[in-house]
């Protein structure tokens, strides 16, 4: 099964204009596997001003999502995002195990990485590959009273 969305828009932002287009496909590979993503391009234009160095700018945002259900109790999901504005790639991986209704265990791994580490281009000292990362263990229990 295949699904998705296509969206676009034209509008104003502060004293400028914006044109945007987004495509978001989804694929249901099987009962257990779903993959999808989105790509959004936004073009901004602004009038020239004395204190403004850029009058045009294009932003690209790409996202990937995937989910796998091992069975009714265990699932794995992944979310990866790229932004040319931030010059970073972010990733989130999550494993969830549902012991019973209201009792869940999560293992979550997050990572944020730089895509442009060149000191000549950035004007900064060489950036590390990884900007931040975390590993989280979470247990939830809903009390019924």
Protein language model regions, located:
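Hydrophobic, lipid-facing positions within transmembrane beta-strands of outer-membrane proteins
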Residues: 19-25, 60-66, 89-93, 133-139
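Outer-membrane beta-barrel proteins
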Residues: 29-31, 70-72, 84, 99-101, ...
């Amino acid at each position: 099964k295949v699904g998705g969305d296509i969206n676009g828009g034209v509008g104003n932002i502060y004293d400028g204009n914006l044109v945007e287009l987004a495509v978001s496909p989804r694929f249901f590979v099987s009962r257990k596997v779903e993959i999808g993503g989105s790509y959004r391009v936004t073009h901004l234009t602004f009038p020239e001003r004395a204190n403004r160095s850029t009058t045009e700018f294009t932003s690209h945002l790409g996202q990937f999502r995937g989910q796998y259900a091992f069975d009714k109790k265990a699932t794995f999901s992944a979310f990866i995002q790229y932004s040319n504005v931030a010059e970073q790639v972010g990733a989130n991986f999550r494993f969830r195990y549902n012991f019973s209704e209201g009792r869940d265990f999560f293992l979550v791994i997050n990572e944020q990485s730089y895509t442009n580490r060149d000191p000549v281009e950035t004007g900064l000292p060489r950036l590390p590959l990884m900007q931040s990362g975390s590993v989280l263990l979470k247990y939830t229990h809903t009390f019924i009273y």
